[in-house]
């Protein structure tokens, strides 16, 4: 992102046909990997061997308006049955992150948000960037932790997460009655999104 390039997170657990469709549609210049020599015959860049600091300190000269420049490409489920690419610009990231950080009154050293979404889902932006712009931590929950049902509650307490972003169905796995059955205090905010509340 700092180089002015657009980023597309790729969930490699998706079916082969969906990954193929997204790669053919997006036509990425390179795939960032961790030690992987190649990925589907596309050029790869091993992030484990990149220098810690960039040598260049200036913006790429081809950026006309950095705020409106494409930052990320997300793929939705799409009504056609195949994922559809949706573009997010840098200004959109910043506006969303600042709005969330302000709304939740995030305080550095006191608050931490959770990341329950896949990085390939647009909701991950609000989960991560809202904390980062406020100087707060992000609690990265594994798939196993997210699916832990009632056992997720002590994890949230131990990590001191104060804002839980989650699909509503996650709340119903933690307790039969999410409206009244969650222990207090759990988080300052619970933000169900992505589907109808059960």
Q: What residues fall within each predicted segment?
A:
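Conserved AMP-binding/adenylation subdomain of ANL enzymes
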Residues: 84-112, 122-162
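Carrier-protein-dependent adenylate-forming modules in NRPS/ANL systems
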Residues: 1-94, 105, 135
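Phosphate- and divalent-cation-binding pockets in alpha/beta enzyme and binding domains
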Residues: 18, 39-41, 173-176, 193
């Amino acid at each position: 992102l700092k180089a002015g390039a657009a980023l597309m997170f790729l969930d490699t657990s998706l079916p082969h046909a969906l990954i193929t469709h997204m790669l053919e549609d997006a036509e990425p210049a390179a795939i960032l990997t961790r030690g992987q020599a190649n990925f589907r015959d596309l050029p790869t860049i091993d992030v484990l061997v990149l220098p810690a600091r960039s040598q260049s300190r200036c913006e790429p000269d081809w950026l006309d308006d950095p705020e409106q420049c494409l930052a990320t490409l997300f793929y939705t489920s799409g009504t056609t049955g195949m994922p559809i690419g949706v573009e997010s610009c840098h200004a959109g990231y910043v506006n969303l992150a600042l709005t969330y950080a302000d709304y939740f009154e995030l305080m550095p050293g006191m608050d931490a948000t959770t990341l329950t979404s896949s990085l390939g889902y647009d909701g991950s932006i609000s989960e991560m960037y809202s904390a980062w712009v406020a100087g707060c931590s992000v609690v990265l929950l594994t798939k196993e932790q997210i699916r832990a049902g009632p056992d997720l509650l002590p994890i949230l307490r131990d990590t001191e997460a104060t804002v839980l972003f989650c699909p509503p169905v996650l709340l119903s796995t933690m307790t039969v009655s999410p409206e009244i059955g969650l222990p207090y205090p759990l988080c300052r905010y619970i933000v169900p999104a992505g589907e109808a509340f059960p």
